[in-house]
Design a protein with these regions (language model features):
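Catalytic machinery of carbohydrate-active enzymes
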Residues: 2-372
Length: 372
């Protein structure tokens, strides 16, 4: 019923007739890119923006994302405008869709893999609408062209780039991009100075641990993060930072209370791009699969990524040097928020020794990065 309300209220019947006559790629001038997912997902889609900007240098590129993920795109030279889809009453959602329709988009690239975004794309009235439909759902009927990935298990960066092939464009391997501003860099440097992490003689080695995640099954046990922090601090005489967003601050503080090395809790302290500027200055990032891991990899920081229910071949770090810890059990890649087996085996089987060994190898060949 909800979709039928949108269809009747925005004149989609006319769009359906017009889209059926669309045969080929236009010289696009006003493109809407849709990614209604999480921070890491939006970050991994940035190579598509680069590809579109290269192919259509004079086009206006607008990206639609969920509220809370827009910081990923701040200062990005490949996008002209970022719009946020707000959660709220249905009439407000309808007005938002009508606003999109008035924008006069001639192309939509939907990177979401979702029914809602497909309906939004159709509602814009754009004659060219590219999207994915790997599940062979009804939404495939709403696109003018369905993008087809080269292989089922390819990395999400490469998967998203297949949308450009659907536009008839050549695709090249892409790397995600973030753009901290000079102000972001200065904010981090001022904090480091105040925290005693900058010294004229020798700045300490910085290691950032990320003990939180979006759902519980992706979380390596807190006590193991605490043990890892102490062992790294003892072995490398480094300063440990505990990251996360504001919602994960309590998790970081719980880990800190279990340690001897007095780590600095930075969870919730910085904006997304300030966090990027901070992790860029760290010698190592160790954390669960999630947005922070992708930010660290994008900034070129060496990463040890701990994977459980998600598949590193699709979602692994892309950017700097990385080591993935993953057990690959028979229930692997369940993508479930809680363990269907009831024992969290995929994370419980990852020992502190294993992560410490991987982290040590990274630190032994990585110089300190406290200077920008």
């Amino acid at each position: 019923m909800r979709f039928s309300v949108v269809l009747n209220s925005t004149g989609i019947g006319i769009v359906l007739q017009r889209a059926a006559k669309s045969d080929g790629v236009m010289d696009l001038q006003n493109i809407l890119i849709i990614k209604l997912r999480h921070i890491g997902d939006v970050l991994l889609s940035t190579p598509v923006l680069r590809g579109l900007r290269t192919a259509f240098p004079r086009a206006r590129l607008t990206m639609l994302v969920n509220r809370g993920t827009e910081g990923v795109l701040a200062n990005n030279p490949d996008v002209n405008e970022v719009l946020c889809l707000e959660k709220g009453a249905w009439d407000a959602q309808l007005k938002f869709v009508q606003m999109l329709r008035r924008r006069g988009f001639d192309g939509v690239v939907d990177l979401t893999d979702g029914d809602r975004s497909a309906v939004i794309g159709l509602a814009t009235g754009a004659p060219v609408r590219i999207g994915f439909n790997a599940e062979h759902r009804w939404r495939g009927l709403l696109y003018s062209t369905v993008a087809k990935p080269r292989q089922a298990d390819q990395h999400r960066v490469d998967y998203d780039l297949c949308a450009l092939r659907a536009l008839g464009l050549d695709t090249k391997p892409g790397t995600p991009a973030l753009y901290p501003s000079p102000t972001d860099e200065q904010t981090v440097e001022a904090w480091m100075q105040e925290a005693g992490l900058l010294s004229a003689q020798a700045s300490p080695l910085l290691v950032l641990l990320q003990p939180g995640a979006r759902y519980s099954l992706k979380v390596w046990p807190h006590e193991r993060f605490a043990q890892l922090a102490d062992r790294l601090a003892d072995r490398f005489v480094c300063r440990i930072l505990l990251g996360g967003d504001q919602r994960e601050r309590e998790v970081a503080e719980q880990v800190a209370r279990k340690t001897r090395c007095a780590p600095i809790v930075v969870a919730g302290k910085f904006s997304l791009l300030q966090f990027a500027a901070l992790v860029k200055r760290c010698a190592l990032f160790v954390g669960n699969d999630g947005g922070a891991m992708h930010i660290a990899a994008t900034m070129g920081t060496p990463v040890v990524a701990i994977f459980g229910p998600t598949y590193p071949q699709r979602w692994g770090p892309r950017g700097g040097p990385a080591q993935v810890i993953y057990k690959g059990l028979d229930c692997r890649a369940c993508y479930h928020p809680t363990c269907l087996r009831g024992d969290d085996s995929c994370m419980q089987q990852i020992a502190v020794d294993e992560v410490f060994t991987a982290a040590s190898r990274m630190l032994e060949r990585t110089p300190a990065r406290t200077e920008t």
